């Protein structure tokens, strides 16, 4: 029985899920983004080299997917910061880096647009903000 496909699918699902959550949480609290970016990049490259050195194919697949996911997450830290500037992700007013973003970019917000109840229709930005602050 060949389990490489299942192994690859599960590894991709869980590593992407972990990366998404980790980037949001780490970027939210980190006073600089270069440190987590460097760590994720270095670990990603190391895991990729480990994947290349493995003889066991399923393990090589797992490490290859984990490595490339970590490398992409390193790139995502700067993209997440851009989402905060544009108001697409919440800023953390307790984070000095985010505090500067809130001052410099009128579109930045502390409202988490993912923490809302859907109303089943399109709403304008004013009503969206009202819906977010009501709950």
Segment roles from a protein language model:
Residues 19-20, 40-50:
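Hydrophobic, membrane-inserted alpha-helices
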Residues 29-44:
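Loop-to-helix transition at the N-terminal end of transmembrane alpha-helices
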Residues 9, 13, 42-46, 63-70:
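Hydrophobic alpha-helical transmembrane segments of multipass integral membrane proteins
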